[in-house]
């Protein structure tokens, strides 16, 4: 149904359209919004921020060119998704374009003001990294959303910080932009030229067309590494250079690993490199559990990668479980993290007991074994670290002033247990108290990063060249990479044929 505009007599124009409810039966009703402004432009559409009338609720409206002969896959998938950590589609409607027979699909979604990428870039400008407790909070919610998504057979295929919306007031993270998502069916081929380059799983680079949802786990590992490092872990300049960057860190894949990634791969010459110990990839103060979790996601063999919910059960997230009554800096409680639905409890029932909160004071945190801590990125045993080997391969680690010019200090609740391996160091001198997240993103312990860290993060924008945006937030619902356009068009991936009846 085409949109209709009505002038309400107010200063700002109110647009009224006939829209369809996103969930349940196709019930159509009039909705009205005002104060629409463009917050993002992408290869396949424009995103507006608007205010609903009369509720004043803020929404994001993603407008994409639609071919009426096809069903838009993004719409079909979003209508099936209901999860606390996935952006909610509220309504959809069609509108006419300037050209004859030009029709646009408009997706009306909930609005969140920030993205993980935007927050990450703020830290990079201040030569800081995101405090580890925010890494913990945000990565948990990302993995939980992926566990739900994958259980339905859907693969996101474009996991990256730009597609993770944040509300700093509530601490909520929501996965967005399902323009590249697809239901993967065993035996049916899919294009390999998908996913933004820096987060693209190696099996995709090696041309696999029968990949699984484990490509999303690789992307999540890249995101977590980026948050810990303050810069991209694999900053490839091209598709081929991307695998070179991966090999530099993880070593040359074995013939068995190549077969696991793509049984039909025709081998070309790769540089013969040995893998680095994970402890040398990250900074000395990076928590051992964080490094261990990354090592379980960034694995060449797709089936060896941890599942999303097993990732949520990892000891890195035990601090969330040990005290579920922690508070955000504004005094609010943490967002719901353990309100698993009856459906979620059936996804991996054996894992569920590991996901639930533990009694405060219980000693359930598992320290990664010494043997595992000393494995390299290929999972092989590495020599014990010497004093010299404890120096990080990346920029030197030090406390550094925040934007206000004052040294950043950690609240008492952010004391870290010294695991005795050089990766965890005690911060502060106060007794341990219930963990309280910092006053704001810049008020917590944060580590200095290299001078080029922001440029490294910026490359993800400039290189892809896929959007223009106002740093206002929800534009990220249309972050679709030009790096993927060709593949999307050739895949039959973005649309499904409309039923004739």
Curated annotation (Swiss-Prot):
<feature type="compositionally biased region" description="Basic and acidic residues">
    <location>
        <begin position="381"/>
        <end position="390"/>
    </location>
</feature>
<dbReference type="InterPro" id="IPR011009">
    <property type="entry name" value="Kinase-like_dom_sf"/>
</dbReference>
<feature type="domain" description="Protein kinase">
    <location>
        <begin position="33"/>
        <end position="317"/>
    </location>
</feature>
<dbReference type="Pfam" id="PF00069">
    <property type="entry name" value="Pkinase"/>
</dbReference>
<feature type="compositionally biased region" description="Acidic residues">
    <location>
        <begin position="482"/>
        <end position="501"/>
    </location>
</feature>
<keyword id="KW-0067">ATP-binding</keyword>
<dbReference type="GO" id="GO:0005524">
    <property type="term" value="F:ATP binding"/>
</dbReference>
<feature type="active site" description="Proton acceptor">
    <location>
        <position position="158"/>
    </location>
</feature>
<keyword id="KW-0808">Transferase</keyword>
<dbReference type="InterPro" id="IPR017441">
    <property type="entry name" value="Protein_kinase_ATP_BS"/>
</dbReference>
<feature type="compositionally biased region" description="Acidic residues">
    <location>
        <begin position="451"/>
        <end position="471"/>
    </location>
</feature>
<feature type="binding site">
    <location>
        <begin position="39"/>
        <end position="47"/>
    </location>
    <ligand>
        <name>ATP</name>
    </ligand>
</feature>
<dbReference type="InterPro" id="IPR050591">
    <property type="entry name" value="GSK-3"/>
</dbReference>
<dbReference type="GO" id="GO:0048232">
    <property type="term" value="P:male gamete generation"/>
</dbReference>
<dbReference type="InterPro" id="IPR000719">
    <property type="entry name" value="Prot_kinase_dom"/>
</dbReference>
<dbReference type="InterPro" id="IPR008271">
    <property type="entry name" value="Ser/Thr_kinase_AS"/>
</dbReference>
<feature type="modified residue" description="Phosphotyrosine">
    <location>
        <position position="193"/>
    </location>
</feature>
<feature type="binding site">
    <location>
        <position position="62"/>
    </location>
    <ligand>
        <name>ATP</name>
    </ligand>
</feature>
<comment type="similarity">
    <text>Belongs to the protein kinase superfamily. CMGC Ser/Thr protein kinase family. GSK-3 subfamily.</text>
</comment>
<dbReference type="GO" id="GO:0005737">
    <property type="term" value="C:cytoplasm"/>
</dbReference>
<keyword id="KW-0547">Nucleotide-binding</keyword>
<keyword id="KW-0723">Serine/threonine-protein kinase</keyword>
<keyword id="KW-0597">Phosphoprotein</keyword>
<keyword id="KW-0418">Kinase</keyword>
<dbReference type="GO" id="GO:0004674">
    <property type="term" value="F:protein serine/threonine kinase activity"/>
</dbReference>
<feature type="region of interest" description="Disordered">
    <location>
        <begin position="355"/>
        <end position="427"/>
    </location>
</feature>
<feature type="region of interest" description="Disordered">
    <location>
        <begin position="446"/>
        <end position="501"/>
    </location>
</feature>
<dbReference type="InterPro" id="IPR039192">
    <property type="entry name" value="STKc_GSK3"/>
</dbReference>
<protein>
    <recommendedName>
        <fullName>Putative glycogen synthase kinase-3 homolog</fullName>
        <ecNumber>2.7.11.26</ecNumber>
    </recommendedName>
</protein>
């Amino acid at each position: 149904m085409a949109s209709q505009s009505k002038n309400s007599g107010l200063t700002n124009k109110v647009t009224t359209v006939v829209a369809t409810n996103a969930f349940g039966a196709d019930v159509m009703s009039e909705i009205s919004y005002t104060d629409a402004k463009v917050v993002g432009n992408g290869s396949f559409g424009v995103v507006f921020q608007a205010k609903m009338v009369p509720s004043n609720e803020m929404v994001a409206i993603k407008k994409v060119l639609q071919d009426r002969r096809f069903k838009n896959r993004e719409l079909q998938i979003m209508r099936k998704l209901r999860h606390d950590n996935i952006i909610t589609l509220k309504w959809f409607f069609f509108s006419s374009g300037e050209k004859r027979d030009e029709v646009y699909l408009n997706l009306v979604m909930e609005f969140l003001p920030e993205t993980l990428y935007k927050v990450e870039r703020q830290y990079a400008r201040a030569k800081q990294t995101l405090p580890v407790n925010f890494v913990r909070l945000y990565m948990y919610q990302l993995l939980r959303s992926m566990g739900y998504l994958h259980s339905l057979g859907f693969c996101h295929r474009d996991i990256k910080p730009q597609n993770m919306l944040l509300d700093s007031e509530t601490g909520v993270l929501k996965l967005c932009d399902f323009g590249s998502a697809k239901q993967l069916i065993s035996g049916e081929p899919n294009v390999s030229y998908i996913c933004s380059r820096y987060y693209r799983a190696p099996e995709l680079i090696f041309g696999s067309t029968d990949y699984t949802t484990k490509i999303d786990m690789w992307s999540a590992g890249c995101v977590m590494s980026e948050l810990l490092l303050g810069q991209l872990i694999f900053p490839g300049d091209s598709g081929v250079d991307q695998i070179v960057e991966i090999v530099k860190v993880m070593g040359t894949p074995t013939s068995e690993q190549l077969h696991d990634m793509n049984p039909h791969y025709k081998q070309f010459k790769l540089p013969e490199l040995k893998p680095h110990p994970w402890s040398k990839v990250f900074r000395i103060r990076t928590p051992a559990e964080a490094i261990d979790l990354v090592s379980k996601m960034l694995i060449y063999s797709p089936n060896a990668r941890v599942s999303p919910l097993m990732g949520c059960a990892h000891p890195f997230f035990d601090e969330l479980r040990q005290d579920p009554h922690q508070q955000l800096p504004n005094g609010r409680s943490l967002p719901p993290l353990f309100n698993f639905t009856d459906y979620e409890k059936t996804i991996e029932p054996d894992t569920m007991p590991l996901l639930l909160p533990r009694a405060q004071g219980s000693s359930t945190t598992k320290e990664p074994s010494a043997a595992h801590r000393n494995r390299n990125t290929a999972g092989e045993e590495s020599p014990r670290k010497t004093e010299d080997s404890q120096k990080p391969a990346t920029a030197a680690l030090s406390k550094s002033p925040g934007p206000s010019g004052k040294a950043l200090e950690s609240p008492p609740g952010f004391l870290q247990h010294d695991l005795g391996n050089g990766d965890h160091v005690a911060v502060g001198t106060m007794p341990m108290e219930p963990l309280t997240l910092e006053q704001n993103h810049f008020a917590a312990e944060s580590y200095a990063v290299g001078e080029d860290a922001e440029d490294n993060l910026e490359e993800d924008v400039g290189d892809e060249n896929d959007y223009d945006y106002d740093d206002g937030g929800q534009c990220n619902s249309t972050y679709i990479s030009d790096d993927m356009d060709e593949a999307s068009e050739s895949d039959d991936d973005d649309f499904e044929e409309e039923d004739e009846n």
